[in-house]
Amino acid sequence: TQGVSSAASDVYKRQGSKGSDYHLSDLTPKFEVVESPGGLNIGVRRNAGDENYYWRVTPWIMPWYTIVPPYGDNPLHGHAWVPIDDENCFAWTFSYHPSRPLNELELGVMRDGGSLHVQLMPGTFRPVMNKDNDYMIDREAQKARKSFSGVKGIAMQDASLQESMGPVSDRSRENLVMTDKAIFMARRQVHDAALNLDKGETPPGLDEASQAVRSASFELSREIPFNEAPGDPMKVKKGVAHTSI
């Protein structure tokens, strides 16, 4: 799999995808966030012609799951951010397709540390690219404009920014904006769930119905809110492929 580059990740991720065309043609998306029985649904909206919007919807399921919206017939990916202690957590990443096995190209990209997966140091859960080696940033690739960040793979690009904030951030110095709406809504839900748990109430997101959801991407009339899309595109249907364009 060594020959499978991180560029291949983008190839299989978006190849033949109508959603990719919408993504590239509208670089100023709008965010909408609504509460769900088990957490939040985070919608990103782009123009899809004169009458429709192209939606990519990420479910955040209490207390630590996210599922990334798909492109075309490509796999679904997700994360579980599981605390270890007050300053560290495991970031478990999973990939699957509801109606078929993953193919060799998809598996090769993942083994090579592409897409949302990373290569690990043997015998550990620590990524090969990490803070101690500056995430193996490739300055020459940046100079040649082959890579904006110089860091290989979406997962490590994200991790490099997340870890740069330190283990515990000073919330009083944050400057959240409307595109951060999901952040403060999720914090509020976790805060409220903790208080209610202390009163003996069961936290949301633990029942089967709340967990039986998928991410989705779809076109929808501009007149219809994404959380009212016909056919419930985020509902799990066993053996049936996810809703994606």
Regions found by a protein language model. Name each.
Residues 10, 39-40, 87-90:
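A generic structural micro-environment signature
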Residues 13-58:
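Polyanion-binding catalytic cores of nucleic-acid enzymes and NTP/SAM-utilizing transferases
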Residues 44-245:
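Peripheral, non-cofactor segments flanking catalytic/redox cores
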Residues 1-8, 12:
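Single conserved hydrophobic/aromatic residue that forms the stacking wall/gate
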